[in-house]
């Protein structure tokens, strides 16, 4: 059973509702402290909400810690046609706790609240798990907030406390941390991994109305079965490691949860084969990738294919490298509010 990410949100109300704010847009600026009392405030506490940009300190088989950053935003789901973005926050640096400001006048017993990733990837209604992710730094999750990172929760009024709401958020996507290495010293010396493709037997990406339907594929559009992560375009990441080296070349993917039969393709270059792009293909098999969890995939790519996915046969040295590669899969326990086990 998936555990929700829990924290509290506080609502400090004003008397008048500023109807001009009910348009789903807001400022990306930090709200000055002197103005805080003018707004309804959502305050996260007990750990950050659900951040992809700074999922820090993840290691194989463990969760991660998270932090808010200044351009994070929340959305209130008021109705099918009305989603309200906060007008700002009090965040000036990475922090586990933050205040998000909305107009006053909210008195329902509960509100649905969504985190929809970076505003470049949402209009407050839809988010996109994109066909291409661009990861510029090894072992970094910055790109995921542009590619479908999202969460939902219900803010419920706390009994006996005016304007105080508590909410439990849940990550909606599943996440992969892919860590390649090459046990063959002939090919790995100077090798650079350029991109990674994740192929599935069913949809792992698309466009979704998170507030109304979450990541339900029955209500998604632009569904597709593949995701490509382009690495530090066009330079790639080093891949001269003989064993797993997360800091050197870990790749992160955000995708739809569910049962998937995944195949991962690793495209890279080696000085031993000038002008060629090598490809190693690893099938993971059919398994469940739960929402609100990260699955670590450690893959030895020491057998080689050309770009046409056929074995390379250009000499005895290469034939020695044509051994069966290995892949291990480690699923983290579902994260709690700090993304730890």
Locate predicted features.
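Sec-type signal peptide cleavage vicinity
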Residues: 2, 6-15, 22-341
């Amino acid at each position: 059973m998936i555990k929700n990410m829990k924290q509290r949100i506080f609502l400090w109300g004003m008397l008048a509702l500023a109807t001009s704010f009910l348009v789903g847009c807001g400022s990306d600026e930090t709200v000055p402290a002197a103005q805080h009392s003018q707004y309804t405030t959502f305050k996260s506490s007990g750990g950050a909400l659900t951040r992809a940009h700074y999922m820090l300190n993840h290691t194989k088989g463990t969760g991660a810690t998270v932090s808010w950053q200044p351009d994070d935003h929340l959305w209130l789901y008021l109705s099918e046609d009305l989603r309200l973005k906060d007008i700002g926050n009090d965040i000036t640096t990475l922090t586990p706790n933050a205040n998000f400001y909305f107009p006053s006048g909210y008195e329902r017993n509960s509100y649905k609240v969504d985190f929809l990733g970076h505003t470049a990837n949402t209009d407050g209604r839809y988010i996109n798990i994109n066909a291409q992710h661009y990861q510029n730094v090894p072992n970094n999750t910055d790109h995921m907030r542009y590619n479908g990172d999202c969460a939902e929760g219900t803010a419920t009024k706390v009994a006996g406390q005016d304007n105080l709401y508590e909410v439990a958020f849940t990550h909606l996507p599943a996440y992969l941390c892919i860590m390649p290495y090459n046990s063959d010293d002939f090919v790995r010396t100077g090798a650079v991994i350029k991109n990674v493709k994740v192929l599935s037997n069913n949809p792992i990406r698309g466009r979704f109305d998170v507030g109304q339907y979450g990541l339900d594929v029955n209500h998604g559009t632009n569904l597709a079965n593949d995701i490509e992560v382009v690495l530090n375009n066009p330079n790639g990441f080093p891949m001269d490691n003989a064993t797993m080296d997360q800091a050197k070349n870990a790749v992160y993917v955000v995708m739809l949860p569910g049962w998937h039969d995944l195949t991962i393709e690793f495209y890279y270059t080696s000085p031993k084969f000038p002008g060629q792009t090598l490809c190693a293909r690893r099938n993971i098999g059919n398994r469940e990738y739960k929402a609100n969890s990260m699955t670590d995939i450690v893959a030895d790519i020491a057998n080689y294919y050309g770009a046409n996915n056929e074995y390379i046969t250009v000499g005895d040295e290469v034939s020695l490298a044509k051994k069966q590669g290995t892949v291990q899969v480690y699923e983290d326990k579902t994260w709690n509010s700090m993304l730890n086990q």
